[in-house]
Amino acid sequence: DKHNKNPYILKITSYYESKKYKEAVKSLETVLQIFPEDKTWWVQLGSFYLLVEDYKKGLATLDLAYKQGFLEKESQIKTLASLYSQNEVPHKAALLLEKHIASGLVKRDDKNLSTLANAWHAAQHIDKAARYYGEVAKMTNLAKHYSKQGMLLKQDEQFKKAIVALNKALELGVKDEGRVHMSIAE
C-alpha cells in the first residue's frame, strides 16, 4: 500500500499559491506522518511555520531536519542559526555557523563572520567573539569592527591586544572616538 505523493503536492501547492499558509501547514503535517523520510517536506514545513509566524515550531522542525541531515543549503543553515539566536540559544547558533563556515557550506565572508561573532558574543564567549570580529575587521578594514574587537579584548583582560585594535579603530576614524580613547586610558 504505497501512498501517492502527487495529490498532496497539488493540495499544498494550491494552498501556498492562494496564500492559505495555515492550510498548507496542516497538509504538510499530514504528509510528514505518511512520508517521514522525505527531507523536502521537513524543510518545507519548517519554512511554512515561519510564514505563519510560528517560530517555535519552525525552530523545532528545522532543528529536527538538521539532526537528520536534511539541511544541505547555506540559506537553510543560516535560517536555523538565526532561529537559534532569536530563541535565545546563541551558543547553538555559533556552533552551527562555525561548523558550516569551516566546512565551506556557509560562505566565509564579512556578513557571516560578523553574525558568528555576534552569536559568540551573545553566548558570552568573549575570546571567540573578539577573534571573529578581528577577522571581519581585517577583511573589511572598518573601524567599527576593530572597535568591537578591542572592547571585547579589553573585557577579556587582553589589554595589549585591545590597545592595538582600539588604536586601529581610531586610525580608521571610528565614530565614538571619546569612548575608544577612554577605553585605552583605562
Residue ranges and their predicted role:
Residues 1-186:
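Alpha-solenoid helical repeat scaffolds
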